[in-house]
From Swiss-Prot:
GO terms for biological process: cell wall organization; peptidoglycan biosynthetic process; regulation of cell shape. The keyword Magnesium does not apply. It is found in: Membrane. It comes from Haemophilus influenzae (strain ATCC 51907 / DSM 11121 / KW20 / Rd). Residues 254-433 form the L,D-TPase catalytic domain. It holds the Pfam family YkuD. This is Putative L,D-transpeptidase HI_1667.
């Protein structure tokens, strides 16, 4: 064992030199029992335990060498550009060393486009670190050279991670007080960037990262006109924040778009607006979620299965207070097997705030009205008709339990059922029968429930009430508006 230990130390020293010079990566030894030697070490006389010990020692030494190499690269980069704050210093140190510190940003148009888009993101106030990166770059812009190139690459990596993840992280970054925190982008995204550099396609690559929604583009383009000369920046930052919400929505070309605070549904086909309708959305305590889905089917004469929360909070107190409430509203009480339960058999006094049964309202006279438009949703959200038509005349229509009530549900159903092969006569016949009938959706009909309270359209500001308080929840960073305006123009 003493001989093995000495051999191991000498061999590790030799391996260290070899690894430092070649940058090789070692594979696991214990999985390759047929190996007779490794870098001059005779393995044939070693037990499995000794081989494992050798593997662990080599791995630890490799890790140490990797860390030392990274430290050396970091020091070299600092020597080249000075001690500037970078969000991705280790990655940039490796990248620029591999390129012998050749610049990546020789395309000035691409650099300007990146800074314009990045400044728009910074203006939203969702990231203090991004705001700091922009200010750091501005300090060295006149100096130019490698330091400017590296800082611009640092900004690109930040923006690249943001653009690749903002759609999936919108609820955290754009609708809550959680700050956006940059992470290293995935390697394939980094390689796309570097490939664009090598193929002189950097401007195209930067432009591909921008949002496609035309209201996003109009808002960003017009934003410099609304940047304040005083500290009164509320509307400017509101516009900038909502522009980022717009960037995750595709342009209005195909599908159903419901902007929750506008209480409006718009249905587009091939770029044409074919239906616009007032809607009712969830209350502040039962919010309609920001979500994306696709319509799956239309149900004519749908029954209504009351959500558990609504049963416990709304229906249960009414059913306990009035024995006739259930029959008057055409409700049925069902057990877990779907069997009808006689309300008279229930010991109402023993039930606290959790009703042990399901509640269903029969088709024809249900809270869903004549139509239900289903779509996959983890929150059991869907579009539907309503018998309470007068509610659509209210200015504040945040009145539902989360689902979206559509005023022109009959017109929407006619459009979708026609695509499913139904005639208007068949639709009316099924309606009159009060029989529940479902028709699958044949065409691709995405549904976007989104929340945007301010944007610029044709040069004019549209400013809506923040009905759910999402604008107020954002933990906004301090913005250098003069700097933002400089790069946005």
């Amino acid at each position: 064992m003493v001989v093995f230990k000495s051999t191991l130390k000498l061999s590790l020293f030799a391996l260290s030199l070899s690894m430092m010079m070649s940058g090789c990566v070692l594979v696991g030894l214990s999985k390759n029992d047929q190996s007779k030697s490794l870098y001059g070490i005779n393995l044939s006389h070693l037990s499995l335990a000794e081989r494992k010990e050798l593997e662990e020692a080599i791995y630890a030494d490799q890790q140490r060498l990797t860390e030392e190499k990274q430290t050396l690269l970091n020091m070299t980069l600092t020597h080249e550009i000075g001690d500037h704050k970078l969000q991705f210093k280790p990655l940039l140190a490796r990248l620029y060393a591999s390129r012998k510190y050749a610049p990546l940003w020789t395309d000035n148009a691409a650099a300007r486009q990146l800074l314009r888009d990045y400044a728009a993101m910074v203006a939203s106030g969702i990231s203090k670190s991004s705001a700091t990166s922009l200010e750091t770059l501005a300090l060295v812009e006149q100096q130019g050279g490698l330091v400017y190139d590296v800082l611009l690459s640092d900004i690109l990596l930040d923006y690249l991670y943001y653009t690749q993840n903002v759609r999936s992280q919108a609820s955290n970054w754009l609708y809550s007080s959680a700050q956006y925190q940059a992470q290293q982008p995935e390697n394939d995204h980094i390689q796309r960037w570097l490939s664009a550099v090598e193929n002189n396609q950097l401007l195209d690559f930067i432009q591909s990262l921008a949002g496609e929604n035309h209201l996003y583009r109009q808002t960003i383009q017009s934003l410099p006109m609304f940047i304040p000369t005083s500290k009164e920046s509320n509307i400017t930052q509101k516009l900038a924040m909502n522009a980022q919400r717009l960037r995750v929505i595709p342009d209005f070309h195909n599908g159903i778009f419901v902007n929750i605070p506008s209480y409006k549904l718009q249905y587009y086909r091939d770029g044409d607006l074919i239906l616009e309708s007032r809607v009712i959305v969830g209350t502040n305590s039962r919010r309609t979620p920001v979500m994306y889905s696709k319509l799956s089917n239309v149900v004519v004469n749908p029954p209504w299965n009351a959500p558990i929360r609504l049963i416990n909070e709304d229906l249960l107190p009414k059913m306990k207070a009035d024995p006739n409430y259930i029959t008057e509203h055409n409700y049925s009480i069902l057990d877990n097997q779907g069997n009808v339960v006689d309300p008279a058999s229930i010991d109402w006094e023993s039930i606290d705030n959790k009703f042990p049964y399901r509640v269903r309202q029969a088709a024809g006279d249900s809270a869903l009205g004549n139509y239900k438009f289903n779509m996959p949703s983890s929150d059991a959200i869907y579009l539907h008709d309503t018998p309470n038509r007068g509610l659509f005349n209210r200015k504040n229509r945040a009145l539902s339990s989360g689902c979206v009530r559509v005023e022109k549900s009959d017109q929407l159903a006619s459009i979708l059922l026609k695509e499913a092969g139904w005639t208007e006569t068949r639709k009316n016949t099924v309606l009159a029968s009060k029989k529940t009938t479902s028709a699958p959706i044949r065409s691709d009909n995405p549904v976007f429930l989104y929340y945007v309270t301010a944007w610029i359209e044709n040069g004019n500001i549209v400013n809506l009430p923040d009905i759910y308080g999402y604008d107020r929840q954002i933990n906004l960073a301090e913005i250098n508006w003069d700097l933002v305006k400089k790069y946005l123009q």
